[in-house]
Amino acid sequence: MGREAFEAVLRGSKKVPDSRRNRKLRDKVIFGTAFHTPARGRLEVLRDALIVVAGDGRITEVIAQGSGDHDAARARAAEQGRLVELGAGEVLLPGLVDLHIHAPQWPQLGKALDVPLEVWLRKHTFPLEARYADVAFARTIYDDLVSGLVANGTTTAVYFATIHMEASLALAEICRARGQRAFVGKVAMDDPDQCPPFYRDENAATALDEMRRFIEAVRAIAPGGDALVHPIITPRFIPSCTDELLAALGRLAAETGCLVQTHCSESDWEKSFVEQRFGRSDAAVLAGFGLLRQHTVLAHSNFVSDDDLDLIRARGAAVAHCPLSNAYFAEAVFPLREALDRNVRVGLGTDISGGHSPSLLDGCRHALMAGRMRQGGVDAGLPRDRRGVADARITVAEAFWLATAGGGEALGLDVGKFAAGCKFDALRIDVEADGSNVRVWPDLDEPEDVFQKIVLNAGRANIRQVWVDGVCVGGTAGDAGQRASVSR
């Protein structure tokens, strides 16, 4: 299929080179076709729209094709040298929001996923994370991680780092330098009965002091309410922390206004451990310690009850749905449909490296698959009416919303959609890129079909440019793609 055929589907524009990587050139007008899901399950196709981006990286206006000011606005932008036109075969998507990443586990991506969780943690994960006491080692890994995730379209990332102050701060610095929007958490884990002796905080007081200093340090390198990089309070999970530490971190969250992230009811073991220790569920315990707050991110949450979901919603917290790693280590599927029906905030997480893919587009695919298998059931030996959960599956538009606007809502950020007031975090997708698996047939495909094919088949090779805060920070176009000027 040629580029002309693609344009017959999208009615797109001729190709004009893209903008430079220059933070002074946020002020721009993008012309082309964009897809986004501004509300759960609702796909909106913006054909030949103008997206006006101000110098602060925020969208000030989206001008639809056919509106009275469209042609005049396009002409003005061209005269001012502000117009960036998408080329033939190119469309715009919102940037992807990954709610759950274990940054230090990047070197073991794709390793040891065929062993039990206990082996995975004790033999592979904890020894690897302990190595981040070496800051030079940490910087090498973290720089590769952040650049790799940006290339895969992750414009906002929520990171677990390690217990090490300097290495965790290095991750925050690298995110800022690479231009990725990020929440970075120095991990807190002090319980000697559950944490290995070579990898834990000395005690609750030390962990609290270092968390406080970490928050101050991150806010110093990225000052201001509109900063790209933020600290996030990160108790690893309830079993790894003493009561003293959990209570102290809850007070610190209230004092500093920092967001919180942790694991919640991921597995049978975790659920049982917490219930035996406290007589309550993970969600209830976190609430009791002051850690279940507005925009707290709860990774997994597979074994939550209806009461837990209601509590999570009432506190304004959110779930990071990690369908791939759930399949490997949780041995359960998150009740996504039930959470959405209860208006719980939910987004997607890759859960590197419990999940082996760094792509949140893959995360959309895994969420779709998990929903379908949960609805259909997996035990063919059972009667059909006993195999699955009714209405559990989700649509492609819902999956993409989870990866974009849903993730933004989870964090309280104006990202994930193209609307006035939102940050311009976006992906320039080229369906005709070398090696592309996206195939479009103008006699068969409507624009909505093209969207689905991109979500289900596009990959890193298709991501020509990545914008964060109105600035191009990555993509396959590279330096050559940055040198070309905007149209006049």
Predicted ranges, named:
Residues 109-180, 209-225:
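Alpha-helical scaffold segments that flank or form the walls of functional sites
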Residues 1-79:
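N-terminal metal-binding scaffold of metallo-dependent hydrolase/deaminase domains
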Residues 39, 423-484:
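C-terminal cap of metal-dependent C-N hydrolases
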